[in-house]
Amino acid sequence: MEHESFKASERLVTPAYIRQGREARRMHEQLVRQLVEQGKCPKEPWDESTIEIFLNELAVMDSNNFLGNCGVGEREGRVASGMVSRRHYRLIHGIGRSGDISAIQPKAAGSSVLNKLTNSMVLDIIRLAGVRTASSCFVVPMATGMSLTLCFLTLRHKRPKAKYIIWPRIDQKSCFKSMITAGFEPVVIENVLEGDELRTDLDAVEAKITELGAENILCVHSTTSCFAPRVPDRVEELAVICKKYEIPHVVNNAYGVQSSKCMHLIQQGARVGRIDAFVQSLDKNFMVPVGGAVIAGFSDSFVQEISKMYPGRASASPSLDVLITLLSLGASGYNKLLKERKEMFVYLSSELKKLAKELNERLLETPHNPISLALSLTSLSEQSGSAVTQLGSMLFTRQVSGARVVPLGTSQTINGYVFKGFMSHSNNYPCAYLNAASAICIKKQDVDMFIKRLDKCLRLCKKEKHLAKDEPRCAQQTTEDDVAELAQGLGDVLQGETASELLLSG
């Protein structure tokens, strides 16, 4: 309520009580004012009531929620289902206009404020996470692959003769298809093996640039976050090469915001060389539903060019989700999650190393990968060709998600390109292995349960050879111990939620 309404309320209720209520309301308003004025993620989290007040205030600024609105156009923010309307907090118009995803909508002032604030808050988080000189970013309602495509299509207008993209190999389909979809020819640079790690072959990159001609290359497409034993590209050195040959540089930073090491690589690359844009996933870094990404860069004008390349208006759902999430966490809450992730990486590494020693395997030495780990499966691979993939199936049926097994000798054809040793980022990696990652929001309980189930599965797979024929059938059966373990895990979760509710109510 505004001031006059509060004054009028004093005729209905004791004025002292009304003044107290007005002060409570003012506290919410002060938080909103600080957010709008500063455009930064608040240090401390907001409670849900403040967030809902703010979103409702934004919604009533959109024309579809005007009390006397009369819409006669083809797109008037009409929604048939009340449930759908509530799901979106009645913010129906989306973001941007037909020519620019970052443009203001005249009949959706509230949604436009939401869009601008979200972009500003995400930029603040990117800077806090380590890329301090990033100048601009925007949330786009497409996942990482399509967002990379948008960057490549923008560069096409700057380099119309270019047809190649230099790409140090990473065995992940969407980043490869992003180049194909944009109409370019990927030039795959094989990684070099250094110890257990797969690292960028800088000499091969420079040789290809010389061979093809810099003017024929759209950009270098490098990667930070990835599955071990591949490690982040030598972004700093690649940035220097790009600056030397005046070639654009786009970085796939899919889940790198959560890693200070990945963010430092981007910051250093921009400092000593050239990075035009870096793209990161919303769901992997900000714990929201799949379907959004952040495109960021060091030049306001170039980032704006990318936003103008997006055709039509766009869904506001990813922007709304990340806005609510960052307000719920605050900068302090997000930093806490980043710190916990680092701690859990150390814990996961130590537990896998213990298990590897017990089972005569090895945790591969990949010190340059800050998120993913790899456990060798040498003895399992020697046992039989299908034993490695069988382990993956066993883990999945025991409700272990995210872990992936990489057998030897797998080939995959993507858009006519043949990748030998697919999933291992190399034609001939020396051993089969299993991946596990310490990503943001992972808990100690996740690690403990994973190690316990992995131990069981590996011991099953390593039974005497005369039992091997029965293993595929038996291994898939869920035992009473498995059921008891799942029940215990569910009980721990429910107990934790009950404790949280009691703390909140207290």
UniProtKB/Swiss-Prot annotation:
It comes from the Eukaryota. GO terms for cellular component: cytoplasm. Pfam families: SepSecS. The modification N6-(pyridoxal phosphate)lysine is found at K284. Its EC number is 2.9.1.2. The record marks E74 as: May act as a substrate filter by repelling compounds with a negatively charged alpha-carboxylate. Residues 96-106 are annotated as: Phosphate loop (P-loop). The keyword Transferase applies. It is found in: Cytoplasm. Belongs to the SepSecS family. Pyridoxal 5'-phosphate binds at R75. TRNA binds at R271, R398, K463. One of its GO terms (biological process) is conversion of seryl-tRNAsec to selenocys-tRNAsec. Its cofactor is pyridoxal 5'-phosphate. Converts O-phosphoseryl-tRNA(Sec) to selenocysteinyl-tRNA(Sec) required for selenoprotein biosynthesis. InterPro entries: PyrdxlP-dep_Trfase (IPR015424), PyrdxlP-dep_Trfase_major (IPR015421), Sec-tRNA_Se_transferase (IPR019872), SepSecS/SepCysS (IPR008829). This is O-phosphoseryl-tRNA(Sec) selenium transferase. One of its GO terms (molecular function) is O-phosphoseryl-tRNA(Sec) selenium transferase activity. Substrate binds at R97, S98, Q105, R313.
